[in-house]
């Protein structure tokens, strides 16, 4: 392996590493979205099941207020692009379940792409290691032969 090929492989390894980081971040965001949707489903279902409708409303900065849910069957959902729709509680739960299913499918695709990328990175790393080992063997070959010759001379005495 010549110097140029080694540099090219190192470049690809770096680029693939950056792509892998992007995929890993996407997976983390998707998992956070999935967990938020699961928590929302749990909260919506608990409102229907009973209680007095009092919830903790986080207002930021670690502060919360006790709030009374006036209409637990009317749920406002952000469906994307800052579009908010009102749905009945049960329909909102179904919408969130569908969103979770979509997120899980996307997570699977991104995870598969990440695995392929990591496999390619491993192959490149192996090629680089082989190239370095060959270069070291070629550079150290004359020295090793020289040392080996001394060893044979000493054995013969």
Sequence positions of predicted segments:
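Intrinsically disordered, low-complexity regulatory regions in eukaryotic proteins
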Residues: 1-79, 83-157
